[in-house]
Amino acid sequence: MELGCWTQLGLTFLQLLLISSLPREYTVINEACPGAEWNIMCRECCEYDQIECVCPGKKEVVGYTIPCCRNEENECDSCLIHPGCTIFENCKSCRNGSWGGTLDDFYVKGFYCAECRAGWYGGDCMRCGQVLRAPKGQILLESYPLNAHCEWTIHAKPGFVIQLRFVMLSLEFDYMCQYDYVEVRDGDNRDGQIIKRVCGNERPAPIQSTGSSLHVLFHSDGSKNFDGFHAIFEEITACSSSPCFHDGTCVLDKAGSYKCACLAGYTGQRCENLLEERNCSDPGGPVNGYQKITGGPGLINGRHAKIGTVVSFFCNNSYVLSGNEKRTCQQNGEWSGKQPICIKACREPKISDLVRRRVLPIQVQSRETPLHQLYSAAFSKQKLQSAPTKKPALPFGDLPMGYQHLHTQLQYECISPFYRRLGSSRRTCLRTGKWSGQAPSCIPICGKIENVTAPKTQGLRWPWQAAIYRRTSGVHDGSLHKGAWFLVCSGALVNERTVVVAAHCVTDLGKVTMIKTADLKVILGKFYRDDDRDEKTTQSLRISAIILHPNYDPILLDADIAILKLLDKARISTRVQPICLAASRDLSTSFQESHITVAGWNVLADVRSPGFKNDTLRSGVVSVVDSLLCEEQHEDHGIPVSVTDNMFCASQDPTAPSDICTAETGGIAAVSFPGRASPEPRWHLMGLVSWSYDKTCSHRLSTAFTKVLPFKDWIERNMK
């Protein structure tokens, strides 16, 4: 029996908890309840209870009904605990339920008041407080119930403060203001510093915030209530009271305080003091320079300047101004700033981003001439000791950015080991205002690969090797879709913006019509034939122009050479470097005796073959074949060819290892020998694969190359 009672009490308590958390419209259906709005509260409703009240505002009779249920002892209990008439406590005018004997949901919905007193809102008029953002306004709280709690936050525009004035105050009085009170805090929350706490009916002096926000809290306890309070607020500034005298202008600062900008003849924090009119004496121009009046009223009698006069200073050629460029005559008769001086100096020479500059400590240099030696011998050691030579004075005065003192030395070096310097490594500022030596520049080091010999070239990453790609205009061999890129040739990078390539690679077959630059691109830093293998180290560069040699013959492939100008500079690194261009006088041996290394990718490789993913840049050594022998060799195979002076033939060197088939690889030919710029071996571009009739890579027929030596001057002219 006791267990059943406790279970029933628990269920009833759970029902009461559910009442407060129900949504406005119920969805649970209990057929035993009188109305759907009650079905979650009771077991089996059988009766109702009538609550009769008097509205405190207009004194009319109002009320509502709630259902009642029979308990186990057949006693009638209300289905929920209700506060009776206190729900109308703060209403100015009340709403009325259908309490004349019909069940309703009036109490459940919570809209008891038809009208609230000023400052209150909500269905029971018990809610108050808000966030106020306005230049002025009011806070009005008409009467108040017990245990009320209201908060207002007032925000002003930046740079303004808030002033709060109480128009009416009627609260329970206490010396400590601990029962019913209004508390004003600086800031926008209850953590701010308390400015004032008020109660009773004595209005305080106007309250002002230090910042742009103010927090107002109203609190009432559980006994006694009065008429409430009425306060007005407005945005003000420190300049609102016009604190400046003599028509001075009040200027606000970021902290919210003010400063007075005084008219001429007045001074003081509030422009309260009258100044005697003063003048400034002529400051004069600096040595090796001059002055000009550039503003204000100017000079009086050519010797004194009126207050507000602005003087600008300038220096003669090869001198630089150190100090204030302008000075203004102030109201105290003094010039602003300090008098500048003109110093011998040099403007720093412009350098490229590839050059690193370092300013050396200033040391006055000295020279000895035969005349110095004559004077040293003519005077005794004693006289020299009695009249010691003074050390030259070091430069003084600060210079504007971009200038250096006389005798300053600048040291230059390249920012990367892949570049070499041209011009002077050290330059000195001369008395003429110019710099000694020649302007430095850094250019990429060409043809340098560490520890590489000609016979052992397989598996090398040739950093000047450029892959030339063309965009398809239709289906190609059934494996490329429209717009895909495919490898057509190899070229040679000769500087950061120039690639040398065979002309037939960038023209329509058998014609001199050049392919559109938008349908060509250059890939640098590539090693694997598969385009997906080197994507982190490669550079994909667009082409701005194609320069075809004017003597190019698309039938005989004579002068088969062209230049690609890159739209963007190549980034020089371990994987991307240019190759050198050679002249005939640079060759230590005859051209026919040279062992030439050829490198390139297999442009005819099948992307579906198993080894395609691991196929890399191929290289091998070839030997030059006499031109007449090359022609006869082709005639023996029924192929009449003409080898011009702009070509050379070569075939694979049988004594050197090789993994290249020149007939399948549009590559470049290079030779390593010491250059003029460095005694170390450098790789030089000698040729470009032009044509071959060897279809089986049997090496019975030589491959023809475009000889680069005759075109060296033409290439260098177009590299600039």
UniProtKB/Swiss-Prot annotation:
Q: Could you tell me which InterPro entries the record lists for this protein?
A: CUB_dom, EGF-like_Ca-bd_dom, EGF-like_dom, Peptidase_S1_PA, Peptidase_S1_PA_chymotrypsin, Peptidase_S1A, Serine_Protease_S1-Domain, Sperma_CUB_dom_sf
What region holds the EGF-like domain? Answer: 235-272
Q: Which UniProt keywords apply?
A: Disulfide bond, EGF-like domain, Glycoprotein, Repeat, Secreted, Serine protease homolog, Signal, Sushi
Compartments it resides in: Secreted
Please give the residues the UniProt entry marks as glycosylated: 451, 614
Cysteines engaged in disulfide bonds, as pairs: 128-150, 177-199, 239-250, 244-260, 262-271, 280-329, 315-342, 414-442, 489-505, 630-649, 661-697
Q: Which residues form the Peptidase S1 domain?
A: 445-720
Question: Which residues are in the Sushi domain?
Answer: 278-344, 387-444
State where it is primarily located. secreted
Signal peptide interval: 1-21
A Pfam family this protein belongs to?
Answer: EGF
Q: Tell me the GO molecular function terms.
A: calcium ion binding
Show the stretches that span the lipid bilayer: none
Q: Name one GO cellular component term.
A: extracellular region
List residues of the CUB domain: 128-236
Please describe what this protein does: May play a role in regeneration of skeletal muscle.
Question: Which family is annotated?
Answer: Belongs to the peptidase S1 family.
User: Can you say what this protein is called?
Assistant: Inactive serine protease PAMR1
- Source species, please? Pongo abelii
Q: Which gene encodes it?
A: PAMR1
